[in-house]
């Protein structure tokens, strides 16, 4: 049996929330896609969307029978990170804990490398 290192963690809390959000949809192929774009106050920002397509080179991580998809360009900035879901006084949201970010903005949605 080989020991394959997964480059990104998809937490149980995030998987549970994705599962609850897609249960009402009429598309069992939906997955959460996390991606990085230029912008935000720190240079890069995280984006989340639901997608039923897996493109060539995409990484798919399964947890609780739901998938997280990351394109190769975004993955290089996310290696070693964690995609989580939090609920608190400031609201609920998907968050990325990224060890590659040298700084993040106050809201946590943008970062710099």
From Swiss-Prot:
Gene Ontology cellular component annotations, sorted alphabetically: cytosol
Fetch the NCBIfam families from UniProt: iron-sulfur cluster assembly accessory protein (TIGR00049), PRK13623.1 (NF010147)
On whether Repeat is a keyword of this UniProt record, the answer is no
Known Pfam families for this protein? Fe-S_biosyn
Protein purpose: Required for insertion of 4Fe-4S clusters for at least IspG.
Gene (name only): erpA
InterPro entries named among the record's database cross-references: FeS_biogenesis (IPR000361), FeS_cluster_insertion (IPR016092), FeS_cluster_insertion_CS (IPR017870), FeS_cluster_insertion_RrpA (IPR023063), HesB-like_dom_sf (IPR035903)
Q: Which residues bind iron-sulfur cluster?
A: 41, 105, 107
Q: What is this protein called?
A: Iron-sulfur cluster insertion protein ErpA
Keyword annotations from UniProtKB, A to Z: Iron, Iron-sulfur, Metal-binding
For biological process, the GO terms are: iron-sulfur cluster assembly
Q: How is the cofactor bound?
A: Binds 1 iron-sulfur cluster per subunit.
**Top-level division of the source organism's lineage:** Bacteria
């Amino acid at each position: 049996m080989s020991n394959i290192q997964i480059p990104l963690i998809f937490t149980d809390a995030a998987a549970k929330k994705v599962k609850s959000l897609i249960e009402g949809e009429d598309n069992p192929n939906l997955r959460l896609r996390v991606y990085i774009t230029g912008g935000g106050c720190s240079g890069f920002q995280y984006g989340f969307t639901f997608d039923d397509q897996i493109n060539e080179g995409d990484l798919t991580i399964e947890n609780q029978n739901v998938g997280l998809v990351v394109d190769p360009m975004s993955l290089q900035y996310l290696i070693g990170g964690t995609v989580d879901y939090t609920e608190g006084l400031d609201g609920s949201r998907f968050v990325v804990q990224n060890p590659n970010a040298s700084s993040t903005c106050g809201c946590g949605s943008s970062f710099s490398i």
